[in-house]
Amino acid sequence: MVHESDVCIIGGGISAAMLAQKLSELKPGLAITVVEAGSRIFDSENRHTYRARSLAFGENAWPGDFIEDQAGAGIISRTMAVGGSALHWGGVTNRFSEEDLTLKSRYGLGVDWPIAWTDLERHYCEAERRLGVSGEPGPFPEDARSEPYPMAPMPLSYNLKVLKEWAEKSGILFNGTPQAKNTRPYDGRATCLRCNTCEICPTGARYSPDYTFKALLAAKTLTLHDRTLVRRLVRSADGKRIEAATGVDRARNGEAVEYRAKTFVVASGYAWTPHLLLLSGVANSSGLVGRYMNGHAFIGAQIELDAKIYPGMNEQHSLISRKYFRCRQDVPFVRHDLRVWESSAGREARLKDAAGTLLLGDAVLQDWRARTARGAARVRAYYDVHPSIDSALTLDASRKNAWGDPMPSIRHVWDEASIARRAATREHILGVFGQLARANDGRVFNVSEGNYLDHPAGGCRMGTDPKTSVCDSYGRTHDHENLFVVGSTSLPTAGCTNGTLTFVAVTLRSATRIVSSLI
């Protein structure tokens, strides 16, 4: 079966939702088709039940959000459904900083982005409006905004108020972490009730792409084909254009399908976008498809503090400091965010004390009260590392899906400069944790380090030179005039904080160029 449209978007996650919404506004009547390998899970009315069963029995709150044999090795999300990973994201919407776009020119590290900060900042504001972000202006002048947040910040719980006062005794300024959660009715969705299960929001207060897709379908501004796996992009005879996308309809026993469009946009995330390009042998004259896979490293710890808190009140909300987003050029490079959450570490009820003595009856409560006289905070820093060209997604012939396609394998490799400064970065971050503790008669314990990169991105990095990048700043591939890639895959570096708002902003910036390319 052959389907025709003006724009064919491959992938149905948050980038696809934002792009489809903006395209439909920029050019009403545009024929837009969204093709998603997973299923549409449009059952928000059941999420109270899913949440309850998850809490009671530990059940998966998102049954059916994956494809059994569509998986790879490395840090690869298994989620495949209309809405993508943002069906169950935490909703954190931090911005990057200007330093992220000018790493090479400022510090001689990594690579500069081909986007000006003022341009990106404008699209940050647009992304915050579309997602519905609640937040407050930060205390640092470098983080000045051209527009206020759409909504007032999430209220700080008693615990976070105590922790903010505690943390700022160190001289480090904090504010509430911005989030795509409603603090008032917004865009037809309810106010956050602080249910503390953001991964399965029962009220719709936390933004989720399925709400956008449902609205677009109701307005008849797009066609959505779910359970349809695109397997190849087909080049024109001269190789300058993509003339078709071919795949299988999983709802019809693997029946062959073909999509023809004026413009194709691959919005399948950091893993599946380069995977499709590699399978198809397209957009890779630079040899960099699947290369420069990135993310950020992290160090976390618990800190005992001389304050009493009562864990359990909106534990997912946190404080953030952007103090260390900036690094002077005359000192060793280190950039990181700094987050603080309430914690019950070491303060849970127990039936044996530290000596192994059995505790029963009143002894359990006495022990518990004694150990909660001093509270605890969880702290974590995402820090900036940069990828080597060998940080790559490759095709693994030993792992194939039902249609014989090799699955992806991701191996993250830091560049030499990131490896060389790792020990100094660790020392600096632990020093910051120590500063927080010392200012409050506390102690640091349970230090942990990830052995992987969080919030992964890359694989189709943007740039101005076709020899050193896959696409331009709008996501148009250098090799094919009607093929765009959007989302986290185009980010040259992953910053030192959550990247969702950034790649949504970059995607929204691409929408205008995609529409103009159709004229």
Enumerate the predicted regions with their spans.
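Loop/helix patches that line or flank the sugar-binding groove of alpha-linked glycan CAZymes
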Residues: A392-G404
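Conserved redox-cofactor binding core of oxidoreductases
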Residues: R106-G108, D112-V230, Y452
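Mid-to-C-terminal "cap/lid" subdomains and adjacent gly/pro-rich loops that border
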Residues: S39, K262-Y383, I519
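Short, hydrophobic/aliphatic alpha-helical segments
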Residues: P63-S77, E255-A261, L319-K323, V485
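Short, hydrophobic/aromatic-rich segments at coil-to-beta transitions
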Residues: K240-T246, A376-R378
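N-terminal glycine-rich phosphate/pyrophosphate-binding loop and immediately adjacent elements
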Residues: M1-C125, S285-L305, P311-Q316, R509
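Glycine-rich loop(s) and the adjacent beta-strand/alpha-helix scaffold that form part
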Residues: E25-T33, G38-D43, H48-T49, A219, ...
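A glycine-rich dinucleotide-binding beta-alpha-beta segment and adjacent secondary-structure elements
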Residues: T177, T191-T197, R231-V234, R374-V385, ...
